[in-house]
A protein has these predicted regions:
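Helicase motor interdomain insertion/brace
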Residues: 1-47, 52-740, 748-760, 797-875
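Glycine/proline-rich, flexible active-site/cofactor-binding loop segments
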Residues: 743
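Conserved SF2 helicase motif VI
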Residues: 772-795
């Protein structure tokens, strides 16, 4: 099916290094990422041509997706009507594939290849059978023109788990296989020999070929006989960073769905079908492998100096005795406490989390829930828990508003095993941030007895009513503006939200509909408020002024400042006949931000100035939305304005004077110099292009609608969680990869694989340990990726910048025994995992390990050029 492609030709067709599009592969050249990826595409095509199957098993973060897309694109160049199906773990990852294909088409492909694939349209399919958005529907759409029509469908592996009707649950395994066989037959009826190529991302999902799950049964029915006429595709391309995810037999189990491998050892199968290279990152001192910069830490928790947590634990122990008496249970009784209980109201336990590995209940769950909620009702706060405590101390910056605070250290990724833990961690971290925000607001408003007010307000759970009656600036609470039609936040009615940032939201159904905080943000958004231009870019995107605004012939209608300045930027003129000039030209804060960038960061200034006006306009919408809805900067701005009002600089009779005075006051106080606003401005510019192209899927150079960044409006909490019950996970991925919220993301295994979370984060916490080294590596791989924060730090600062991996545990408990046993065995298995050759991982817990288990924590190895030996090279 493929033309004859050599390595040089592939490097000419696909530009794997966008900074050097003239780069060409030559024999004997120095090892580089682009050379590795060219070799990968070539090696995969050779294996597909020879064996009809290839396994791309490169280490996490090496660009398996773009290599697979390279293979697919060359297939379409060779056979323009090729039919291709991609199976990925979930629809979020399917969307990432679509984004990456558009990147390849518009950026990586040379003119010839771009022309050859211009007709390809990636289609996200809900599942195989959906009448409106199913794979079968798309196949039937082209059945009358198969010779000319190509096909590129993407759907989720999870769709194989939902084929059994409710009335057939008693015989679900047989029914799942039967339903999948029907799908196979319907595909074969139209496509005859099936798809030209099926690509399976995270192929280790199919490592349990002999398992008794619906997914396994459905997979056997869908994929057909490995060597028979029912085979779903002519060729299969499998992707996984952990081919021996749990043990070495996983290799043949995965391949066994598509090829008869019974006569081969796992090692022989890897030699024949696999490409596996180990990742390296070019940095300040040379090429690093992961052991040069990974730094593992333990976070030891205990009851010392925390009598409240010890008291709660004693009450918990007493409740266990009262409930179970002397009956067994042993260490299983401790799982709920050690993994973390939930002190807020529980959600439904019947939720799809993608795997049995994320469990909801332990033996002690109900006891913990009752005790913790009683505690919460009594003391208005969650009961102390030492393991939660050490995590909170590490993830919540006490110096958030200090001049020396570095926001690039605010991102933290946390993995748990129990589903309630993600909500509890989120609730506690948001509560800690609320204390920081509340103190900042009280300092700005300077009410009498603010220390006493702080405690009273906290006891009222940061009540809107208490804030309005006892704290907020009475002279500045009401604005005569129309209300913005705000969509409610992700967690608008949730008890785990940030209650302080909730003050900035208009609550149409609340008895306290508006607050001084919501009125302030309303000023910065509503077009009829002059302050809505405060965070807009300058007229020339540098330091330019604005001269006029729109009015209405109807005196009952309000002026429109925002539309006027946006029209001016777009058309270099205003578009209404009803124009009034400002009393004097007005600037925005953008001018001061630009001047400070010019004075402090010449390289980043070059980046910003290299952008077209279209890109700068897109960036301005992104930046303003993030600042107002998904960052602590809204608190900073509110505090500035409150101090400005208290200083009696606000002119309530002339808004233009008030606006100019506010800008002058900020300038004279030199507030921008060390502000969060400026820090976020710098951080947002630094990663904007990567966020657009790699995460969001927006064209960096084309006009986009102002609401393109509306997902950020739903992220006004510092912490959030990802589990099966969270529907829109894409916005969490966007937010976490931006400088904006969430700063802390807690996740079950649903974010363990295939999700890119690397642009802003270099810290991962295993609150609940992974079950295997393979799963542990997948978790770390969410942030240990090329071109992310870890890689940027290696380029800038070298080996010492590091990737930090944390393991919290409760000292002198079963928790310590679990962790010690895992760490000792993990190190031996990591080397075997690198080579794809480990034997069974022993999950048993050794209770005899001494304190020297800490020596097994990974510390950065002394640097020398990594010299990785690839276990299964491409050529």
């Amino acid at each position: 099916m493929y033309k004859e492609y050599d390595l040089t030709t592939i490097s000419e067709l696909v530009h794997f290094n966008l900074n050097r599009k003239d780069w060409i592969y030559t024999d004997g050249m120095q090892k580089s990422l682009e050379a590795t990826q060219v070799e990968g595409v070539y090696g995969l095509i050779q294996r597909l041509k020879q064996h009809d199957i290839a396994l791309l098993a490169d280490e996490v973060g090496m660009g398996k997706t773009i290599q697979a897309l390279g293979v697919m694109s060359l297939l379409w160049q060779s056979k323009p009507n090729a039919k291709v199906l991609v199976l990925a773990p979930n629809m979020v990852i399917c969307d990432q594939w679509r984004n990456e294909f558009e990147n390849l088409r518009h950026k990586h492909a040379n003119a010839d290849l771009a022309e050859a694939i211009k007709h390809i349209r990636p289609i996200l399919c809900k599942n195989f059978i959906d009448p409106d958005h199913g794979v079968l529907k798309e196949i039937h759409q082209i059945q009358n023109d198969l010779e000319k029509q190509a096909l590129f469908c993407l759907t989720s592996i999870h769709s194989l788990s939902g084929l059994v009707p409710e009335d057939s649950k008693n015989n679900c395994i047989a029914v799942a296989r039967e339903k999948a066989q029907e799908i196979n037959e319907r595909i074969q009826t139209v496509l005859k020999d099936g798809f030209d190529l099926v690509v399976i991302d995270e192929a280790h999902y199919f490592r349990n070929i002999n398992g008794g799950s619906q997914r396994v049964a459905a997979a056997k029915g869908l994929f057909g006989e490995p060597n028979g006429h029912t085979r779903l595709a002519k060729q299969y391309l499998l992707l996984t960073a952990t081919p021996s995810h749990s043990n070495i037999h996983d290799v043949n189990n995965i391949l066994g769905f598509f090829k008869d491998t019974k006569a081969l050892s796992p090692r022989d199968s890897l030699k024949r079908y696999a490409v596996r290279r180990l990742r390296f990152m070019q940095g300040l001192e040379g090429a690093y492998n992961k052991y040069h910069y990974r730094h593992e830490h333990v976070l030891e928790a205990n009851f010392k100096e925390d009598p409240s947590s010890e008291l709660f634990f004693a009450l918990y122990q007493k409740a266990l005795v009262d409930e179970y008496g002397g009956k067994g249970g042993g260490k299983s009784f401790l799982y709920g406490y050690l993994e973390g209980f939930e002190s807020v109201a529980q959600h439904s336990k019947a939720q799809e989390d993608g795997s049995a590995e994320s469990f909801y209940t332990a033996v002690d769950t109900d006891i913990l829930s009752q005790l913790s909620q009683q505690f919460f009702e009594k003391f208005n706060q969650a009961p102390a828990h030492p393991k939660y405590g050490v995590l909170q101390n590490k993830c919540v910056p006490e110096d958030l508003f200090d001049k020396d605070h570095q926001i690039e250290n605010d991102k933290n990724l946390i993995f748990v095993r129990r589903i309630p833990s993600v909500r509890e961690i989120t609730q506690r971290i948001n509560a800690d941030y609320d204390e920081i925000f509340a103190k900042q607001i009280l300092d700005a408003l300077a009410p009498p007895n603010k220390t006493k007010l702080f405690q009273q307000w906290k006891n009222k759970k940061w009540s809107r009513d208490f804030f309005k009656k006892k704290i907020s600036n009475k002279s500045n609470t009401e604005d005569n503006f129309e209300e913005i039609n705000e969509s409610q936040s992700l967690d608008d009615e949730s008890p785990i939200k940030s209650h302080i940032l909730d003050l900035f939201i208009i609550k149409k159904n609340d008895k306290v509909k508006t607050t001084d905080c919501s009125n302030f943000r309303n000023r910065l958004v509503i077009p009829s408020s002059l302050f809505s231009i405060l965070l807009e870019p300058s007229s020339d995107y540098k330091t330019g002024d604005y001269l006029s605004f729109y009015t209405h012939e109807d005196s009952q209608k309000k002026a429109d400042y925002l539309s006027a300045i946006r029209d001016y930027r777009k058309n270099h003129k205003v578009l209404s006949e009803n124009i009034v000039n400002f009393e004097m030209p007005l600037k925005t804060l953008w001018a001061d931000l630009y001047i400070q960038l010019k004075n402090e960061d010449g390289e980043l200034l070059k980046t910003y100035n290299s952008w077209s006006d279209v890109v700068k306009e897109n960036f301005s919408h992104y930046f303003k939305t993030g600042i107002l809805y998904a960052s602590p900067v809204i608190v900073e701005l509110y505090c500035w304005f409150s101090k400005f009002v208290l200083a009696k600089k606000n002119n309530i009779n002339d808004v233009q004077i008030s606006y100019r005075n506010f800008l002058t006051w900020i300038h004279n106080k030199k507030l921008l110099k060390t502000s969060l606003l400026y820090k976020y401005f710098v951080a947002a510019i630094s990663t904007f292009e990567a966020l657009c192209s790699k995460i969001v899927g927006l064209s960096f150079e084309k006009n986009v609608q102002p609401d393109a960044w509306k997902d950020l409006k739903q992220l006004h909490n510092p912490a959030w969680y990802a589990s099966g019950e969270v529907q829109n996970r894409k916005r969490l991925i966007i937010g976490f990869n931006s400088p904006f919220f969430p700063n802390v993301l807690s996740a079950t295994q649903i974010f363990q694989e295939g999700v890119n979370l690397h642009l802003q984060c270099n810290k991962v916490f295993h609150y609940g340990m992974a079950w295997t080294p393979g799963a542990n590596e997948q978790r770390i791989g969410r942030i240990d990726r090329l071109f992310g924060k870890v890689h940027r730090n290696l380029i800038k600062s070298g080996q010492n910048s590091g990737l930090h991996i944390y393991y919290p545990y409760l000292k002198n408990t079963f928790d310590q025994e679990q962790l010690a046993s895992f760490m000792v065995k993990k190190q031996d298995f990591e080397d075997q995992l690198d080579r794809g050759m480990q034997s069974d991982f022993d999950k048993s817990i050794h209770l005899s390990l001494a304190d020297d288990w800490l020596k097994y924590l990974r510390k950065p190895k002394p640097f020398n050029d990594c010299g990785n030996t690839d276990p299964y090279p491409a050529i």
